[in-house]
From Swiss-Prot:
Recorded superkingdom: Bacteria
GO cellular component: bacterial-type flagellum basal body
Gene Ontology molecular function: any one: cytoskeletal motor activity
Family as reported in the entry's similarity comment: Belongs to the FliE family.
Main localization (coarse): other
Subcellular location: Bacterial flagellum basal body
The protein, known as: Flagellar hook-basal body complex protein FliE
Length: 120
């Protein structure tokens, strides 16, 4: 549920930036000072930045992995309140969350390389 809210916030920020850039008269007419001011206003209006959202997502994946590890350790110690199915489900959730995070990282690195290889 929180991932959906994070995505919605990111989409709102992107839409606000798009509106502001079109208000400047298109890509050829953007004044750098006005663009920076518009970006600052969008940040204030739309909440956390992309980096903050990414950090929150990484922290959430870390929490899921720690919970899975803790549950597995409890099961190995013989805690009767922990069932093997719960351990397996938590382990799979942690694995899926980590795989998704790696995919996002790979896409970000690819996008960064594309931007860096653009001719000026």
């Amino acid at each position: 549920m929180s991932n959906q809210m994070d995505i919605n916030r990111l989409l709102l920020e992107m839409r606000a930036l798009k509106q502001q850039s079109s208000a400047f008269g298109g890509p050829g007419a953007i004044n750098a000072d006005r663009a920076v001011q518009g970006a600052d206003q969008a940040r204030k209006l739309n909440g956390p930045q992309f980096g903050e959202l990414l950090e929150q997502a990484v922290n959430k994946v870390n929490e899921v992995q720690q919970a899975s590890s803790s549950m597995a350790e409890s099961y190995v110690r013989g805690d009767s309140s922990v069932d093997v199915t719960d351990v397996m489900i938590a382990s799979q959730k942690a694995g899926v969350a980590f795989d998704a995070m790696v995919q996002v990282r790979n896409k970000l690195v690819e996008a960064y390389r594309d931007v860096m290889n653009m001719p000026i």
